[in-house]
Amino acid sequence: MRAKNGPGSWLALTAIATSLNTLALAAAKTINHSYEFNPVVVSGGGYITGIIAHPTEKNLLYARTDIGGTYRWNADEDKWIPLNDFISGADENLLGTESVALDPNDPDRLYLAQGRYLNSENSAFFVSQDRGATFDVYPAPFKMGANELGRNNGERLAVNPFKTDELWMGTRDAGLMVSEDGAQTWRNVSGFPQANANGIGIYWVIFDPRSEGTVYVGVGVPGGIYVTRDSGESWEAVPGQPVEWDEDILVFPAESQPQSTGPQPMKGVLAENGALYVTYADAPGPYGVTYGGVYVYNTTSSAWTNITPKTNNSFPAPFDNQTFPAGGFCGISVDSKNPERLVVVSLDRDPGPALDSMYLSHDGGKSWKDVSQLSTPSGSGGYWGHPIEEAAFKDGTAVPWLSFNWGPQWGGYGAPSPVRGLTKFGWWMTAVVIDPSDSDHVLYGTGATIWATDNLSKVDKNQSPGWYIQAQGIEESVALALASPNGGDSHLLTGLGDINGYRYGDLDVPQPMFDLPVLSNLNALDWAGQKPEIIIRAGPCGHNYTDGCGLAAYSADGGSSWTKFATCIPGINTSSSNPGVIAIDASGKDIVWSSAMTAYWPTLQAITPRTNQSGPYVTTDLGQTWVSPTGLNVQTPNISADRVQPRTFYSFTDGTWYLSRDGGLSYRAYKAKEVGLPAYSGALPIANFNRAGEIWLGLGDHGIYHTRNFGKKWTKITGRGVTARQLTIGAGARRSSEPTLFIVGKAASHGALSKDGVYRSDDNGKTWVRVNDEKHQYGGIAMIQGDPRVYGRVYLGTGGRGIIYADIKE
């Protein structure tokens, strides 16, 4: 029957609608959607410590990193595949690869030696029979240091080509170890000398495939190369090896003495003709090296030859204005098809001029071509580099951040090229490989990415090869700050360790760095709730700007351009490594800056000590003046702004709730018990982006607390077992007026939801579902950020695997 228009009909329809809405609300719960995980693309972002190629299997390449695990190259998809994302937060130390070993007789076998730091007992061997698709994990009886000094050397781990289950491992502090059961158990080679040499230990182990029982081992001391010809029963120092510095290498001995009494063997490669090529330096690296060389040992005649690239044997000649020690050598690779064709790379010639060079030889090192010089446009003044146009994937997708915006050096490796239009040829280029299946294809890693060429032979004609970025799929950055505005062109703003920060409209494409000032770390970000185009950021700079504070800046155009604050707050200056936290009110006019900050990754950044001299400073004139507030007299990291109501700031610090309604000039204090909060050290207030005065607090094992009246009365909204170490909000579900909650922690005291992970709630904490799974743990999640415009999306900040965005599968 057709409905009639009239009061009775309207009331009936209203009653039906109301009834349906009531039923919907009563039945509302968090839907357990499936998720997909993708990287927020930087492409690289960290140090590539090794690139290892299988000697016979085409396109089987692995890249190891110091804090991001290992990747395998997938030629079909033209990208690197991360292999260690299953590592949990509890096993964070395992997300760093000390060494990679491949079985020359079985390309499916892969061995990874995992462990970041020597101060952790948690190290292990990951053993795969399927190229890293799955692993068996065996605890290691010794420590590893994938992010320690000497991580540039290797490989420390090697498979015996004559006994497929036998591996040898040169350790840092436990001597030479042998496993005869595929890395499950280990025994010490008790007769090996120099077991704990130099505090760094053994750098590399090489089996001679021509002679069963012959093994060469390189130790990080002068004269540190040893050989056994009876599988380790007896050892001798390789005779004739360099133990003192060649006078030709000591470029400026009066001004800068080597740090060791003689050359230390960094890497070794045994060519098929029996030539053992060795690179040398005066320190373990990857930083602090000042001298070094390259030698070759004829294993048949026992003769050593100095083949170091220098003035009389390389073309073009070394840069004539070089006024500092020439650095050492580390990276090396030999062509599998021609044992006299090899590349070597210098180490630590930074800051230049005459930066680190890659050299190519066709005659076993008698003569060299300087690949870096030949690849650099003329007129660079010795600052070798690629034209920025070459900083792109093979398909032409640009990786623009590698310019570093040509900003002033901040005092660390990887600073921008001083030549506008160039990106540095590289630094820490200790990982280099000539592809065994294609001698023209060469890859080299840097402190930031992987470069490659398919026509290295152009160097033979004194021409530049064509270079491109081959790092797609590798995401090794450390997340320090995340923000997702509720409007504008950018869905995500990021702050990263070592490489500044970025704004993303397209999450799948590399972006330019934020403009000057370039921050070596970007630790703090915020946006104005009612004017999301206004953004502020802060981080260490290291450059003494005379026209303002280089540690903090604001943007009025969504991050396209930036202006430095006129001055820094008291206690923050050029030498500050931790700039604290910064927040901006909803109108974009009031800014507070606290010198205290939270250490998300204790091994990577420290907490700036809090002081009781002042609370968070406030400015209304973009840093011309800073005012100390009343009512809050401690520098706290737990401060944020209301996203809707201007001039309103919140803080929960040392068991006290603070509320400011005058732009941070004064705060009213409420003891936790008075407003319904538990006794707790403090937490960052999370403000609703749509409703003034609505806030959430994630209080660890105490769960989540919620207020709708600016914190004057709080209610616990979670049940027993909910642990919220990190908390964020995002866009609500369809037809819901409530934002979605995300936590890092646990959502129950037992059962499936009691596992540590990332969880989502669509009904303000009543019910939860897990977002990630055991395959997507990334060594732990340090920070999370919901997206105010995309339901279900959450950004995951990691400590070595970059930033991941998790979306509900369509």
UniProtKB/Swiss-Prot annotation:
One of its GO terms (molecular function) is oligoxyloglucan reducing-end-specific cellobiohydrolase activity. Belongs to the glycosyl hydrolase 74 family. This is Oligoxyloglucan-reducing end-specific xyloglucanase. PANTHER family: OLIGOXYLOGLUCAN-REDUCING END-SPECIFIC XYLOGLUCANASE-RELATED, XYLOGLUCANASE (EUROFUNG). One of its GO terms (biological process) is cell wall organization. Keywords: Carbohydrate metabolism, Cell wall biogenesis/degradation, Glycoprotein, Glycosidase, Hydrolase, Polysaccharide degradation, Repeat, Secreted, Signal. It catalyses: Hydrolysis of cellobiose from the reducing end of xyloglucans consisting of a beta-(1->4)-linked glucan carrying alpha-D-xylosyl groups on O-6 of the glucose residues. To be a substrate, the first residue must be unsubstituted, the second residue may bear a xylosyl group, whether further glycosylated or not, and the third residue, which becomes the new terminus by the action of the enzyme, is preferably xylosylated, but this xylose residue must not be further substituted. It comes from Emericella nidulans (strain FGSC A4 / ATCC 38163 / CBS 112.46 / NRRL 194 / M139). The active site is at 66 (nucleophile), 498 (proton donor). BNR repeats lie at residues 126-135, 226-236, 359-369, 554-564, 617-626, 658-667, 705-716, 759-769. Optimum temperature is 42 degrees Celsius. GO terms for cellular component: extracellular region.
